Amino acid sequence: MKKHLHVIQSIVPGSIAEEMELQPGYTVLAINGQDIEDVFDYHYLVNDEYIEMLIRTADGTEEVLEIEKDYDEDIGIVFESSLMDDYRSCSNNCIFCFIDQLPKGMRETMYFKDDDSRLSFLQGNYITMTNMKDEALERIIRYKLEPINVSVHTTNPELRCMMLHNRFAGKIMEQLQKLYEGGIIMNGQIVLCKNVNDGEELERSIRDLSGFIPNIESVSVVPVGLSDHREGLYPLEPFNREDARKVIACIEKWQKKLYEEYGTHFIHASDEWYLLEGYEMPEEERYDGYLQLENGVGMIRLLTEEFHEGLKEAVTDGKKRHVTIATGHSAVGTIRKLAEELCEKFPNVTVDVYEIVNHFFGEQITVSGLMTGTDLKEQLQGKDLGETLLLPVNILRSGEDVQILLDDITIPELENTLQIPISIVQSNGQDLVDKILGRGEIDE
């Protein structure tokens, strides 16, 4: 196997590394005589009061640095690769995978599927664990890499193998048991597919996973996302209102039972289920501290609570102001309601809220995070958008240039087409209040 070179990209000012005169371009070869596989080896080995670091300088000279420091003090090295290793790709062929449903012609990086336990720890990514051997699980336990976020989908071994198209997928309960016995904190995710892993299979999954409380802190249930680009893929149906009612009833039944037994609600329906059925969002206490926000669980409740808190303290200078908010179908009702509340308090402010229909991925895709520049251009061009267009931060591609949308259209390009400045709203209600009122419009 090719050994990965751990090349220093930069040095943190004022750090031990700067004091030791380490330079970008140097390579870290070993610590305390041990080779470094990746970022977790590195952090585990540097957590000591005395270490010996073998480095190679830019001219090829190797030398050992003796470093004395506080036990958990960071050395101050930034490596060229944040993982200090290659990213591990997904070995599954899931029947619900959204990447398989992307339209052709997007940037190549959009089609990369990761399934890397290190990204689960570092970035909160969800992993299936199908590409993990026992040694990898033992490493997670040894290094106490938690929380680990697991894409479970079903605890039925045969069904999981079918859904993931992977013969190793049926070991999920044994893998979770090993992490549970190792004391690792976890979160789970179930992407629900109609007539596949719902109904009795969902009941089974919740029952099985609840056996790992308290180490599994929460599990989200999310409806499968279906784009218009599913040619040749497994035939999946969208959920309807009656389906949503049944899913919510199942989850709320288990929430009541588990809260009485363990003091945690544990299993959570994503906001999409409540929007599809037309129910009010659960009260804040039911979200157990919003452990599943990244899966769309509690986002609307949290946004609403934060918005109301921000609105209580808000003031304006009395000048007239007109802004536009663009959002997807899922959130449009909530955003309009919040905008009306603000305008009632501040009659000098006008807020127009436009629902953007997703033609790029397909009209069944209704979340704001998958809005594209193409659809924004087509549906907003020529309209009176006021002084500023507000867009949610989750439409920007993460990990890359923050000014780029999913379809490679940039914010400056969009501003030029629509002839209006764009302000990016962070994922909290306070920032929405501030941006509507014109406070803090210089984006990060």
Name the predicted role of every residue range.
Residues M1-I31, D35-D38, E49, T57, ...:
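Auxiliary Fe-S-binding modules of radical SAM enzymes
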Residues I36, E52-L54, V78-D86, H268:
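Extended, hydrophobic interaction surfaces within ordered domains
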Residues D38-D41, R160-M163, G199-L202, D434-G438:
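Short secondary-structure transition/capping segments
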Residues Y42-N47:
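Solvent-exposed segments in extracellular or luminal domains encompassing
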Residues E52-L54, V64, N149:
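Beta-strand secondary-structure signal
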Residues G60-E62, K69-N215, G225-W254:
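Conserved Radical SAM active-site core
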Residues D100, S151, V222, S270, ...:
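Conserved residues at the C-terminal ends of beta-strands
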Residues P147-N149, I185-N187, S218-S220, F266-H268, ...:
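Structural preference for beta-strand elements that scaffold enzyme active sites
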